């Protein structure tokens, strides 16, 4: 079976030659603004999988997000420095979701369709966001994208309705609830119920031990 063009693009992305090119690009990206509109996607295979099309109404934005723990405002009331909660604050969001929100604030008339990872250095992570203008005539006439005009899909990135938002909320079907707090709670609850049922029949099983088959 013949491999598609996108398969070769994926292989090129993982090659050592591309890593050298990416290193030079990261130097340029660090000097650029945190949210910058670009002409074409860097990873065409990932952009196509999200729904990108090279036509009017689509906008590609590269966003830079700082890595590591974040800082919070220092509280006025007194407490131990350990309990200040100022340094090393970890938000309950992924970097990709934060990048999508930054792009949506920069371009409030556009809706976020999806995003993907493009690179990282010692200080920042870089993502490319695929955005769509829901009021553009070309988008309105597209049967696969006109759902963005529905009022229920406005500001979808701020309500956790994108892929990155659903992943952080534990709602992706492919991911399920595994690894989330709700999954762990359900697992423990199931174990407690099974243990309770097992303990309830313990004395009955001991009394009828001689009557069990093979004993």
Curated annotation (Swiss-Prot):
Stretches the record annotates as Disordered: 179-215
Annotated Pfam families: Ribosomal_L15e (PF00827)
GO biological process: cytoplasmic translation
Highest taxon of source: Archaea
InterPro entries, per the entry: Rbsml_eL15_core_dom_sf, Ribosomal_eL15, Ribosomal_eL15_arc, Ribosomal_eL15_CS, Ribosomal_uL23/eL15/eS24_sf
Gene3D superfamilies: Ribosomal protein l15e
Biased composition (Basic and acidic residues): 188-202
UniProt keyword terms in alphabetical order: Ribonucleoprotein, Ribosomal protein
Any single GO CC term annotated in Swiss-Prot or TrEMBL for this entry: cytosolic large ribosomal subunit
Gene Ontology molecular function: any one: structural constituent of ribosome
Family classification: Belongs to the eukaryotic ribosomal protein eL15 family.
Name of the featured protein: Large ribosomal subunit protein eL15
Native organism: Sulfurisphaera tokodaii (strain DSM 16993 / JCM 10545 / NBRC 100140 / 7) (Sulfolobus tokodaii)
């Amino acid at each position: 079976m013949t491999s598609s063009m996108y398969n070769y693009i994926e292989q090129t992305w993982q090659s050592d030659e591309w890593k050298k090119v990416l290193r030079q690009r990261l130097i340029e990206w660090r000097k650029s603004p945190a949210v910058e509109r670009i002409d074409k996607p860097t990873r065409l295979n990932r952009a196509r999988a999200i729904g990108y099309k090279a036509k009017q109404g689509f906008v590609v934005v590269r966003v830079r997000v700082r890595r590591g723990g974040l800082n919070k405002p220092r509280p006025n009331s007194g407490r131990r420095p350990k309990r200040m909660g100022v340094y090393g604050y970890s938000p309950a969001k992924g970097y990709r979701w934060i990048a999508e929100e930054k792009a949506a604030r920069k371009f409030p008339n556009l809706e976020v369709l999806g995003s993907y990872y493009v690179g990282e250095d010692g200080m920042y992570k870089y993502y490319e966001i695929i955005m769509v203008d829901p009021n553009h005539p070309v988008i309105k006439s597209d049967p696969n994208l006109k759902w963005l005009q529905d009022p229920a899909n406005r500001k979808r990135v701020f309500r956790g309705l994108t892929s990155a938002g659903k992943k952080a909320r534990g709602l992706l079907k492919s991911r399920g609830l595994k690894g989330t707090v709700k999954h762990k709670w359900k697992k423990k609850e199931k174990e407690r119920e099974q243990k309770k049922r097992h303990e309830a029949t313990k004395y009955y099983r001991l009394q009828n031990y001689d009557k069990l088959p093979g004993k």
